[in-house]
Curated annotation (Swiss-Prot):
Record's protein name: Stress-70 protein, mitochondrial
Annotated spans, Disordered: 656-679
Gene: Hspa9
Known regulation of activity: The chaperone activity is regulated by ATP-induced allosteric coupling of the nucleotide-binding (NBD) and substrate-binding (SBD) domains. ATP binding in the NBD leads to a conformational change in the NBD, which is transferred through the interdomain linker (IDL) to the substrate-binding domain (SBD). This elicits a reduced substrate affinity and a faster substrate exchange rate. Upon hydrolysis of ATP to ADP, the protein undergoes a conformational change that increases its affinity for substrate proteins.
Location within or outside the cell: Mitochondrion; Nucleus, Nucleolus; Cytoplasm; Mitochondrion matrix
Residues annotated with Phosphothreonine modification: 87
The entry's keywords: Acetylation, ATP-binding, Chaperone, Cytoplasm, Hydrolase, Methylation, Mitochondrion, Nucleotide-binding, Nucleus, Phosphoprotein, Transit peptide
A single cellular component GO annotation: nucleolus
PROSITE patterns referenced in this protein's UniProt entry, alphabetically: HSP70_1, HSP70_2, HSP70_3
Residue spans of biased composition, Basic and acidic residues class: 669-679
Residues recorded as bearing N6-succinyllysine in the entry: 135, 138, 206, 300, 360, 368, 394, 567, 600, 610, 646
Domain of life, per lineage: Eukaryota
PANTHER family: HEAT SHOCK PROTEIN 70KDA
Targeting signal (transit peptide) range: 1-46
Length: 679
């Protein structure tokens, strides 16, 4: 036996026994794509079991989210309850426990910064100790904490929430938007993720979908979705680059489009680079200038910082279309000398200088993606811009310099990803039949072998789904178990890469080192999620896992979060019922009082007084509406309405009889007149 640490180091004894459909495949197929590969991919895409109902496409963004559905052969972006086509990915919890999502949450962020969560997609699937998370803790007003499993979670009013839960609350809002449009329950969804997301982040996104009550049919990469949106109605074959600089992440993908086949050649990116970093850089500049001018440091004042953050975002957007903007924040803070106001002019050139390093960080991934795809910039027929930050003129100029051509404006940078997700949903549902999507895994996968070396089994930019096996052996005499450590990344040593998970194959018969044959198989599904198995070829003993890191959400965690989400959904339903009942009651009170004033001469005084008492009771009930159910308010309002109807019926009868009486006397006078005329 050897120590546990060395048990992790299985020794490589053989070459790869490839099971990959990409390996040794005949090249005589359609458009250079083998028939075997076509069958392998399409078998998963065109599932035999029929998908019932519409499949919604959701772009779960860092800053904003968007939802679309297929209508015939066209994808339609849906408007939310506020009438907007995108929804802020913001979730807030008020002091009384109410949960707000989208624009209502964003509007109250200034007065409730500590309990308003934004850009939590940057935390999804990440460990608390990750350098990026530690950097983020200094930049946000809310609390990022270490969960019991070591992941980064957030805290509001003493309650902990996983980033998957926060994502689920946003997804529930998108689901509700789709259901309002469709008129029925939306169950199936395709959700997008940044192309450079690792396995943990993809799994956490899928968990968010499950928590929200969605059946996530597929997780697809954002640039690939944008390419679908761009190329669905295009007939010419070409190589395109998708430059996706969004709110929190950056991706670059090189794709080849041929007769409805969208094949990703390579992908690269940075999962911690986006509009949030541009906002943060500008915020730091404003705070620094304000301190230089007034001597007041705003960094300890969360409410003031939130106002500056919102002003920075607004200024950033304005400078995409104008060369100068004013930042005015009256009564931002105060000191012993009185209130302090912020008044600042900011030019586009100044802003570009502040964020130039961030823009430069997108260049190396683009060059690497072209290198991996084995294309030069002259081979690229179109450059597609995706993500709100690509509206910035300096970003567009950088892209033009990098690829040697002006970028295309053929797609809406805010909506293209959701449209592409809806198209993929149409493919899975069988409604779109002339599209085939061949995506890739963004990072290499392998295991830790003797000496802590990272041995790759599947290289980055391998077309998925894919499967590959390799034979390893024991590192010590008499070893009866092997611990398999599964890693993802590009570094030579396993410890420098992302540890996705680990498991142990036990029951290996004692033998000299190098004799047992342990076959490790990696299977990456069409979602980019990894499944691993290890098999002792001598005994046939096998151990299989779907990779779940030491962090991540357990099945019980997800079930509890689903219940909590359902509880919130039920609370939202009750709240909506109560609001509707209150509106109805207030309308009845207003109508009743108006009619009482109008018909006061026809109404008996005692009956009027009784009705006024009913109205007073109704008003008292509405004063304590937060503790009442919608049903109680509705019943009380209905009783008031019935009482008022009876009273007004009496008034109507009285008026009718009066008119009848006056009408009779009028008829008699007319007869007398006629009689006189005849004489």
């Amino acid at each position: 036996m050897i120590s546990a640490s060395r048990a992790a180091a299985a020794r490589l004894v053989g070459t790869a026994a490839s099971r990959s459909p990409a390996a040794a495949r005949p090249q005589d197929g359609w458009n250079g794509l083998s028939h075997e590969a076509f069958r392998f991919v399409s078998r998963r895409d065109y599932a035999s079991e029929a998908i019932k109902g519409a499949v919604v496409g959701i772009d779960l963004g860092t800053t904003n989210s968007c939802v679309a559905v297929m209508e015939g052969k066209q994808a339609k972006v849906l408007e939310n309850a506020e009438g907007a086509r995108t929804t802020p990915s913001v979730v807030a919890f008020t002091a009384d426990g109410e949960r707000l999502v989208g624009m209502p949450a964003k509007r109250q962020a200034v007065t409730n910064p500590n309990n308003t969560f934004y850009a939590t997609k940057r935390l999804i699937g990440r460990r608390y100790d990750d350098p990026e998370v530690q950097k983020d803790t200094k930049n946000v007003p809310f609390k990022i904490v270490r969960a019991s499993n070591g992941d980064a979670w957030v805290e509001a009013h003493g309650k902990l929430y996983s980033p998957s839960q926060i994502g689920a609350f946003v997804l529930m809002k998108m689901k509700e938007t789709a259901e309002n449009y469709l008129g029925h329950t939306a169950k199936n969804a395709v959700i997008t993720v940044p192309a450079y997301f690792n396995d943990s982040q993809r799994q956490a996104t899928k968990d968010a979908g499950q928590i929200s009550g969605l059946n996530v049919l597929r997780v697809i990469n954002e640039p690939t979705a944008a390419a679908l949106a761009y190329g669905l109605d295009k007939s010419e074959d070409k190589v395109i680059a998708v430059y996706d600089l969004g709110g929190g992440t950056f991706d670059i993908s090189i794709l080849e489009i041929q007769k409805g086949v969208f094949e990703v050649k390579s992908t690269n990116g940075d999962t911690f680079l986006g509009g949030e970093d541009f906002d943060q850089a500008l915020l730091r500049h404003i705070v620094k200038e304000f301190k230089r001018e007034t001597g007041v440091d705003l960094t300890k004042d969360n409410m003031a910082l939130q106002r500056v953050r919102e002003a920075a975002e607004k200024a950033k957007c304005e400078l995409s279309s104008s060369v100068q903007t004013d930042i005015n924040l009256p009564y931002l803070t105060m000191d012993a000398s009185g209130p302090k106001h912020l008044n600042m002019k900011l030019t586009r050139a100044q802003f570009e200088g502040i964020v130039t390093d961030l823009i430069k960080r997108t260049i190396a991934p683009c060059q690497k993606a072209m290198q991996d795809a084995e294309v030069s910039k002259s081979d690229i027929g179109e450059v597609i811009l995706v993500g709100g930050m690509t509206r910035m003129p300096k970003v567009q100029q950088t892209v033009q310099d990098l690829f040697g051509r002006a970028p295309s404006k053929a797609v809406n940078p805010d909506e293209a990803v959701a449209i592409g997700a809806a198209i993929q949903g149409g493919v899975l549902a069988g409604d779109v039949t002339d599209v085939l999507l061949l995506d890739v895994t963004p990072l290499s996968l392998g295991i830790e072998t003797l000496g802590g070396v990272f041995t790759k089994l599947i290289n980055r930019n391998t077309t998925i789904p894919t499967k590959k096996s390799q034979v390893f052996s024991t590192a010590a005499d008499g070893q009866t178990q092997v611990e398999i450590k599964v890693c993802q990344g590009e570094r030579e040593m396993a410890g420098d890469n992302k540890l996705l998970g680990q498991f142990t194959l036990i029951g290996i018969p004692p033998a000299p080192r190098g004799v047992p044959q342990i076959e490790v198989t990696f299977d990456i599904d069409a979602n980019g999620i990894v499944h691993v198995s290890a098999k002792d070829k001598g005994t046939g003993r096998e151990q299989q896992i779907v990779i779940q890191s030491s962090g991540g959400l357990s099945k019980d965690d997800i079930e509890n979060m689903v219940k909590n989400a359902e509880k919130y959904a039920e609370e939202d339903r009750r709240k909506k019922e109560r609001v509707e009942a209150v509106n109805m009651a207030e309308g009845i009170i207003h109508d009743t009082e108006t009619k009482m004033e109008e018909f006061k001469d026809q109404l008996p005084a005692d009956e009027c007084n009784k009705l006024k008492e009913e109205i007073s009771k109704m008003r008292a009930l509405l004063a304590g509406k937060d503790s009442e159910t919608g049903e109680n308010i509705r019943q009380a309002a209905s009783s008031l309405q019935q009482a008022s109807l009876k009273l007004f019926e009496m008034a109507y009868k009285k008026m009718a009889s009066e008119r009848e009486g006056s009408g009779s006397s009028g008829t008699g006078e007319q007869k007398e007149d006629q009689k006189e005329e005849k004489q």
